[in-house]
Every structure is written in C-alpha cells, then in structure tokens.
C-alpha cells in the first residue's frame, strides 16, 4: 500500500524553519536542517518549497499576519501601536526577519523575477482602517499620519529589539512612546 502524503507536513516544515530561524538566524536555515528539524527528508521539503527564500517568504507571511492580528485585536490605533511594539519586544527574532527581509522577499525586482507574488501589507491595511474608524475621512487621507506612526513605532521597536535602551529605562521609554503616539493622533501629526 502506498504511503499517503501528510497534509500537515508543510506546516511542520514551517514550524521547524521558524524555530531554526529563532535560534540561529539565516545561517541556521538550510534545507537539510529544516528537513531534519521537521522530521522529514530534504526532497520532501523541496517538493513544497523551491528554496530557502521560499521558506523565508512563508515564514514572513506568517509573521506579517501575526502582527496584523495583534493590531486588529486592538480597540484603538493607540492600542494597535502598543500591540505592534509588544510583538516586536516579545518576538525579537521574528521582528528581525520582518524588518530586514520584507522588501527583499516580497517586492524586490529579483524576488518578483523568481516568482514571488507581493502579498499586500496586512499590518498597514489594518492600521489604516483603525485610523479611519477613529478619525473619519477616507483611508487614503491618513497616509501621512500612518507613515509618521510607522516611523515612530518601528523606531521604538528597533531600539527595544537591539537592546539600545537599558532595561532600567524601558518603562520610561515606553511612556514617552505612548505619549508621542497619543499626541500624533490628537494633533494629526504627519497630515
């Protein structure tokens, strides 16, 4: 009797790859290492993913959707910014992949030539909707504010992930961040 394909193998491969990334970054992520960690063989990995970039792209999409879900669960744009920062702080390796590789994996001419399909920008789309719910007008009206917020949130996330802010100063930095986001939303900074 022939073996039946495992319908969850792709998910197992991605889980294994994400764990490898978390432990060792890009150097740890080889097709052979992924296969071993997933409990399968290398040809099985190649049947589901063309190459390492294809696996990274799938992990990246997961991360993008996880961050978007965190922002979506927020009751306000302010809370959405806080949740984004929380995700970056509690998942530094995933956030590292998110900020370092998004353009290269989804939007660069090289990745598009290799068959990558731009996957939208789920975090931006959720935040744009949150801004529209709070401030009214059309979503396109909030482009400059959204850009300004993204710069502040990403900058704060980078400082926390890189451990540039001393642990003793983290609470004060968080208060500054919260106040700055509130001020930007109140004053329409960036519009």
Which sequence ranges carry the predicted segments?
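Amphipathic C-terminal alpha-helical segment
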Residues: 150-168, 183-191
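An amphipathic alpha-helix adjacent to DNA-recognition modules
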Residues: 7-18, 22, 27-28, 39, ...
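Append "Primarily bacterial transcriptional regulators
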Residues: 32-36, 45
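Amphipathic alpha-helical segments used for helix-helix packing
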Residues: 90-111, 125, 158-166
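Amphipathic alpha-helical packing segments from all-alpha helical-bundle domains
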Residues: 107-136, 143-148, 171, 175-186
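N-terminal intrinsically disordered/low-complexity leader segments
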Residues: 1-7, 19, 191
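Short, charged helix-capping/linker segments at alpha-helix termini
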Residues: 27-28, 137-140
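Hydrophobic alpha-helical connector segments
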Residues: 58, 69-96, 122, 145-149
